Amino acid sequence: MKLFNKLFQGDKVIWMVVILLALSSLLAVYSATGTFANTKHHGSNTFVLLSHAAKILVGLGAVYIAHLSKYTYYSRLLWLFFFISIPLLIYTLIGGSDINEAQRTISVFGLISFQSSDFAKVALIGYIARELTLRQDNIKDFKTAFVPLMLPVLAIVALIFPENFSTAGILFASSMVLLFVGRINMKYLMTFFAIVFVAMTMYILIVMNFATDKGRTGVWVQRVVSYVESFKDDETKDAEEIAKQENEEDFQIIQSKIAVASGGIIGKGPGRSTQRNFLPHPYSDFVYAIILEEYGLVGGIFILLLYMILLFRAVAIMAARPQSFGGFLAFGLAFMIVMQAMINMGVAVGLLPVTGQPLPMISMGGSSMLMTGFAIGIIISVSKDINNKEKGDELTTTQDNN
């Protein structure tokens, strides 16, 4: 036990959450990749399993390495990452590789590809946490606090927005919550939110009504329309409308709902999913639907609780480090991860339109696994510092009593 505590420092509950998410990922993705293996790897599920296991190990390695450093080290590192992320995002927009008709990845020598937005998300949260800490004395001031904090948020979100609306939305919402927690003037935040909302609405209206090539905006609008249409009673739809539906976005929604409904309370059992053969991307965007089908409501609630525990532990860390870089950083990263998880799960059960967001630490995907692991490692690093301080205080108290 002493060796374990020495090797794995920090919040043991978060460590347990990470390990359980990794094991859940291995089981769910292996089961969900049957059709993918047949079409891409000549039916070799073993290859897919080993490939995904390697990505999980990379993610866990990122957690472990990140947790070793003192969290204050990330103040300068993430500040540097923020300025690196801006040219990376610009390059992604101009020359990024296409994934699902969107330029989201950067390819390095044709061998390795990663999503620059995953890198930028962690960098921006770190930048905000640093600046919030430095500006606490004048945090209510418009010029010295609000403007210097909002401009970086606007820059990163604007660069992600054209090709990845859902990621931009998650990052914007997470940033706004973190700024609220950091005591930025609520009046300024609400005004800024209203301006961004109006600007986004005008942008969508202009593109949809006047642009020849609607690009990703057309995809977003179609997803929302398909989502709304999915709630209509079948009796109100004619045969042509139903046929059209089945060839578009809500085919995914329909198949996901079938997976969820067929899972029941305890599920069909590991490896017994049938909807993995019909769902597009059952190993990434809709992996939660496969979990619900095979492990039922019990399995779904278990995964949900893991993410909620992560958020609660981050809130506890922030409470132990109020108005400090470590507290802001841990909470901001955890909130962003959990919000992404909630959106993925909401899509899988039909509560939200299709977004394309992976389930953190579970869905198959190298860059997402790496950067999520890095973010969780930073959270553990903050908790490690708190634990060390508490042990030091206990030792000092004991010595004083003696």
Residue ranges and their predicted role:
Residues 99-100, 105, 191-297, 324-325:
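Hydrophobic, glycine- and aromatic-enriched re-entrant/interface helices and adjoining loop segments
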Residues 54-59, 294-311:
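Hydrophobic alpha-helical transmembrane segments
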Residues 315-356, 362:
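Loop-to-helix entry and N-terminal half of a specific, functionally important transmembrane alpha helix
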Residues 61, 69, 127, 219, ...:
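Transmembrane alpha-helix boundary/anchor motif
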Residues 1-21, 27-30, 35-163, 345-358, ...:
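Membrane-helix boundary/helix-loop-helix interface segments in multi-pass membrane proteins
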Residues 132, 174-188, 273-299, 356-373:
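Interfacial segments of multi-pass membrane proteins
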